[in-house]
Amino acid sequence: MKQLHTFAVCAYKESPYLEECIRSLLFQTVSSNIIIATSTPNDYISSIAEKYDLPLIVNPGESGITQDWNFAYTHTDSKYVTIAHQDDIYDAEYLETALKKLEGARRPLIFFSDYYEIRENEKTYSNRLLRIKRLMLLPIRLPMAEQSRWIRRRILSFGSPICCPSVTFAKANLPYAVFQHGFRACEDWQAWEMISKLKGDFLYSPRALMGHRIHEGSETSAIIEDHGRTEEEYIMYRKFWPDKIARMLNRAYSTAQGSNHLE
């Protein structure tokens, strides 16, 4: 029998937060499949998979953010899948809330929720970046807005307020792989832009149901340090705007990159 939902945990090297992430998935109020996917197999990841009796699948191909996420996504045999990032945690009612929204929709594409940040093990529910993202998402809370391609594309035309690890995908209504190879920083924004053009629902919960960890060792912080994000953001803006407006928005949006630093 096909499973309803799978958490696919993408593990990389030896994250000290991996076990905390997995425990948050095990403590969900409704049960789910959980698998661990990695392109960097090691004894540390194997020991955690063995400790919690979880399947461990190894990507034998090219390693990278989009490659690893697509590998995890395509190696799940369930109606819905959440790609869980190893550094993040999920509140106990995340999956229950997601499934209620997804199962109640006529043609779901993705579910996503609000989130909080974890900085030095402290939960931060409000800062400038979080407030901006919540403001950007206000239109999708309007009646019938979740079905509107026009509304979600207008939201995405100003940036990506959707937190990637908060997303659950309805696989039957989506392409085989959702992340485009070649993107390293805006791979999630690219995916939402692609999905936003499809017929179906963007389902949103304004409850902060998961925690996204901010730390200097994260891949996002590394990308910001080498300025790899700005070029990709310009590419994304050009999907919605002419060149001059795209460059103007890109300059304004790039100031938010500092929110991924601990200082």
Residue ranges and their predicted role:
Residues 81:
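Short aromatic/hydrophobic "clamp" motif used to bind/position activated sugar donors
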Residues 4-6, 33, 190:
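Cell-envelope/extracellular polymer assembly enzymes that use nucleotide-activated donors
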Residues 23-32:
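Short, acidic, metal-binding catalytic loop of nucleotide-sugar glycosyltransferases
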Residues 37-46, 61:
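A conserved acidic beta->alpha catalytic loop
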Residues 60-76:
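Glycine-rich, basic loop-to-helix element that forms the pyrophosphate-binding segment
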Residues 138-229:
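Conserved nucleotide-sugar donor-binding catalytic segment
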Residues 1-24:
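N-proximal low-complexity "stem/linker" segments adjacent to membrane-targeting elements
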Residues 93-133:
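Conserved donor NDP-sugar-binding/catalytic core segment of glycosyltransferases
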